[in-house]
Amino acid sequence: MFKWIANLLKPVPDKIEEQLLSNFDFLLNNYNFIYCKVKLGNAVDKNGKFFFYGPLNAYQFYNENVCINILHLVQRDDYNVYITDQKSVNQVYIRNGTEISSELAYNFSLFAEEVKQAVLKHSEWNGYKF
């Protein structure tokens, strides 16, 4: 296959994805985290009831101990961040994880720096081992 055709078929990262990958690159490079973006459809609440029409994207950084789930409700440009024990595409499971303050959810660089400093000093953040 021609290289330019292969490049056309590759997914193009969105602006949010680029910011996240830039800010959280230390997790990928130093702590063997894996990154993925998942489209979750319509948003549901902690009880599984309809909350808002999608699209709802989950940007996830995870390893065998922890998953940082950054949920983005695209139409409203709202963010919520939840920490769970493992990666999942189940919104109820994600939303029942540890919720991170909106101050950090809307400021990726501050969020990444807080995680980085905690991990460097204690090898954990919010009770989750890295």
Predicted regions mapped to residue ranges:
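Intrinsically disordered, low-complexity regulatory regions enriched in serine/threonine/proline
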Residues: 2-26, 31-130
